[in-house]
Design a protein with these regions (language model features):
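Bacterial Sec-dependent N-terminal signal peptides
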Residues: 1-29
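A sequence-level/structural motif corresponding to short, flexible coil/turn segments enriched
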Residues: 24-232
Length: 232
């Protein structure tokens, strides 16, 4: 009888160990240690579906984008030609990502505004193909945040110079082609790097305009679907 009890204890003990090993094997994270570029400084990292990761790096003055798989393998890596700053990297649906920042305007032919440096928003898919490429804002403007709406339009915010050494915060809505639907400028602020899209049936934007220079103000503005301040 005593031997039977001992055997039962041993069996339960072994079953417990096996169960623990199965749990550990099931949830064991994939760890890798790899090098991406010789002098590549990683600026932004964005976790993606399927344990994949998108990274923005900078070598010298040039930016690059690398999309890596679950085990650290490079799915694609490409230079972000024209970009002078990349301020945000966001995951979108359908294995896409959104980049916003500042860029030299790559093709100025046919443009009437003579803008050579402006804000830029780019959407890429998992193969590295550019789905959307939009230049937005006046000369010297810079985008700091972006959001893709269900309609395919984009909400973009950032800053633009307004004469001398001063600047102002901007927020705009553009369609898929880059056409400006509306643009709101907050003259007392320095930039806008935070906003949220609100409303289920009617679109509202709650945006924070900030400033870190002398005489720049910090304000929170709520905009309606036409880009006008909305007062409750």
């Amino acid at each position: 009888m005593k031997k039977t009890r001992i055997h039962r204890v041993w069996i339960l003990f072994l079953l417990g160990i096996m169960a623990c090993l199965q749990v550990r094997a099931q949830y064991m994270p994939v760890v890798f240690d790899k090098k991406y570029g010789d002098k590549n400084q990683i600026q932004l990292v964005c976790p993606l579906a399927g344990d994949e990761v998108a990274m923005v790096g900078k070598e010298g003055q040039k930016y690059n984008l690398t999309w890596i798989g679950r085990e650290g393998e490079v799915l694609f890596s490409l230079p972000l030609a024209g970009f002078t700053a990349v301020n945000e990297l966001t995951e979108l649906e359908d294995n896409r990502i959104l980049l916003v920042g500042q860029s030299a305007v790559m093709n100025t032919k046919g443009r009437k505004d003579n803008v050579t440096l402006s804000g830029r928003a780019v959407i890429l898919d998992r193969s590295g193909h550019i789905v959307t490429n939009i230049y937005a804002g006046g000369q010297g403007s810079e985008l700091m945040k972006g959001a893709l709406l269900r309609s395919g339009s984009l909400i973009l915010s950032g800053m633009e110079p307004k004469g001398g050494n001063s600047r102002q915060g901007i927020l705009m809505k553009v369609d898929k082609s880059g056409r400006v639907i509306y643009q709101y400028k907050n003259a007392g602020s320095g930039y806008c790097d935070q906003f949220e899209v609100l409303g289920n049936t009617t679109e509202y934007i709650c945006a924070a305009f900030s400033g870190d220079k002398e005489k720049e103000q910090t304000t929170v503005v709520r905009l309606d679907d036409k880009g006008k301040p909305y007062y409750v």
